[in-house]
């Protein structure tokens, strides 16, 4: 908003081919729209899990084509963040804190505290008895945890690049997610009011969750998309996503 630019770039390893990447793109877009309802997220897919040259080229193409003011990503290297820094714009990383590599552009990144999983797995292995019981005791073959378990997190906010009151807004939304009061894939959208003293008020508005082709996924005020869809079968992009 401060940049007067509604264009956001996103370098994606994949998109609707995998629920992991698709849900990440969608969740990021919905978060962006809570701050700037007029924002469009332009996705450039590189069709590989890792290729630093392609990641950098995809970021540069988003900048050149759409004049994006932020580069986000679902790929592991810091090349998109370095490209953002080279072009004087901002960025959000993935998998690790990329502020050290791009201190003048990087804001924060989605990260995972793997020690949470390792501790859970080791303690379960020690107490489940027969090793054949391990998978069942862990809750299934796939392990899922989130903010409430401190497995999913965001890296330390780079105060040199973050807008004022960003931390307060993030903390307020985190509290809603952890408490179960709100979910990003529900039929409820968020917006924020910030008082002069920095106090954040989160506003919740019933609104349908729509795809970018106009299909309604969740009715206004409706419950979140099922976890199994988010983690296993989500194959659409939400309204506001443009795939380049």
Residue ranges of predicted features:
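A residue-level marker of the well-folded mature domains of exported/periplasmic proteins
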Residues: 1-244
């Amino acid at each position: 908003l401060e940049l007067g630019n509604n264009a956001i770039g996103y370098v994606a390893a994949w998109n609707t081919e995998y629920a992991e990447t698709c849900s990440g793109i969608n969740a990021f877009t919905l978060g962006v729209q809570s701050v700037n309802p007029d924002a469009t997220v332009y996705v450039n897919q590189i069709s590989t899990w890792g290729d630093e040259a392609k990641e950098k080229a995809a970021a540069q193409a988003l900048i050149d084509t759409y004049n994006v003011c932020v580069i986000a990503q679902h790929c592991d290297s810091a090349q998109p963040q370095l490209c953002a820094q080279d072009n004087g714009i901002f960025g959000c990383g993935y998998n690790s804190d990329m502020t050290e590599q791009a201190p003048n552009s990087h804001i924060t990144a989605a990260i995972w505290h793997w020690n949470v999983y390792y501790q859970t797995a080791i303690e379960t292995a020690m107490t489940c008895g027969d090793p054949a019981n391990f998978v069942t005791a862990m809750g299934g073959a796939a392990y899922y945890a989130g903010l409430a378990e401190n497995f999913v997190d965001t890296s330390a906010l780079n105060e040199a690049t973050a807008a004022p009151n960003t931390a307060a807004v993030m903390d307020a939304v985190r509290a809603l997610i952890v408490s179960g009061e709100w979910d990003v894939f529900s039929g409820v959208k968020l917006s924020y009011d910030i008082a002069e003293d920095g106090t954040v008020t989160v506003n919740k508005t019933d609104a349908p969750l729509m795809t970018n082709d106009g299909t309604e996924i969740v009715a206004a005020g409706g419950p979140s998309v099922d976890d199994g869809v988010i983690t296993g079968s989500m194959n659409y992009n939400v309204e506001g996503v443009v795939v380049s």
